[in-house]
Amino acid sequence: MLEKLDTLGAYLLAVLMAGTFLYFVIAHQLGFKYAKKLFGTRRIKEQSQVIPLEGNLFAACYVRTNQPRIFDLHIHHELSAAFLYRWYSEGKLKLVQQKPAFETVNYLSIQKDAVIRDQEENSLYQKFCEASGKDGLLEVDEVYHWSYSHPGDLYGFSPEDKGQEWLEDHGMMEPVNPKDKLTNLGARIRPLTPAGAAKARVLVELQNFLQAQAEGKPSGPLDTDWIDDLLCYGQLFGIADKLAEKWRTSLTEEQTIVVGLCRDLALAFFNGNNEATD
């Protein structure tokens, strides 16, 4: 009798293992994967090419840095890189190449009379205008030296506070609760409303899609019609360089150069300030 039960148990175990394997094979073919980055383990569509949070980069920054169980990253320089690439895609920045000797030097020329309606975004834009000097050219070393000579709060405001304000204005945050967890700075981590969480979830879906693209994993076809938007968020996630390498056949040489230049300028912008205030 015990021998029969052992045989039956082994048979059921084999069936269970085979069924589980078959399920994951079918799920993979249907374009699903599992993500643990947000709200626990959840099955999501592999390809998510939807602009999250209406394209508001400050809100995305807040979600990434303040919401529990999402991301725990200090991404201010990545936020600046994302804005730089967005301004380039909007025509406010243009690539300038000069050959003073044997090596081409890349700059970004900045349109100093550009109109940016958002006050905080414009504040950041104006600082890059100042860093560009009289010739209006953003060059890595010059941006670093400008930043070093202007120590202090480079933003002039908190990107996270700006993001929280946007989420509040759009009814996506729960009211203040004394029981909410505290950040390292003592601020309350306010949870998103269910509707807000659903919209914020698109951010991690996009991040998962871009991460899979950067790693060369199956993630569905790439919609090249909005590849500049994808590269903007790639900057925010710190993987734009990897994306540019993987998408090199879909990008112009200029786009590839600008991706790296935006990253380098953003790093120079913050490294100079950090070293001046250390």
Which residues does each predicted region cover?
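Acidic, Ser/Thr/Pro-rich intrinsically disordered cytosolic tails and loops
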Residues: 1-278
